[in-house]
């Protein structure tokens, strides 16, 4: 693989954080001038390499923004299965918790629902307090989708029934069913 391909792979893997110039020079074993030349000659159909200070990030070209916005809009209208909704509510109200905790609560294997929630970006697995198993927590996208600013804004049994009904109506609407 040539240095263009390696550079692209490294920046893709680094994601939004990008890679520092020093890291790239060390990994690619090239000079700063060679790195600048690689970046200037980088060509991809939909991607560019942008520099922010000493950090390089692989980003999409501006010409693709309209299509990316459509994708984001579609994702915001995501539909979830009943099982995924159950698992999501269990995680939201009890986080952090492990997959085995969810199975204990639901009395059924929930791996498929968990994988769906992770793939949709609503849940992520993290190591919390050095526990052996990864713990599942909700993401900022979860908060955004459900219109709350922090997890404490979730309705509780102490809140009035109208607020609870509105929240769960929103859940059902996200799932794609009607209340009729």
Swiss-Prot record:
Keyword Secreted: no
Alphabetical list of InterPro entries matching this protein: ScpB_csome_segregation (IPR005234), WH-like_DNA-bd_sf (IPR036388), WH_DNA-bd_sf (IPR036390)
Protein keywords: Cell cycle, Cell division, Chromosome partition, Cytoplasm
Top-level taxon in the UniProt lineage: Bacteria
Gene Ontology biological-process annotations: cell division; chromosome separation; DNA replication
Primary localization class, coarse: cytoplasm
Cell location: Cytoplasm
Keyword Chaperone tagged: no
Annotated SUPFAM superfamilies: Winged helix' DNA-binding domain (SSF46785)
A GO cellular component annotation in the UniProt record: cytoplasm
Span of the signal peptide: none
The protein's assembly and partners: Homodimer. Homodimerization may be required to stabilize the binding of ScpA to the Smc head domains. Component of a cohesin-like complex composed of ScpA, ScpB and the Smc homodimer, in which ScpA and ScpB bind to the head domain of Smc. The presence of the three proteins is required for the association of the complex with DNA.
Assigned protein family: Belongs to the ScpB family.
Chain's role: Participates in chromosomal partition during cell division. May act via the formation of a condensin-like complex containing Smc and ScpA that pull DNA away from mid-cell into both cell halves.
Protein's name in the database: Segregation and condensation protein B
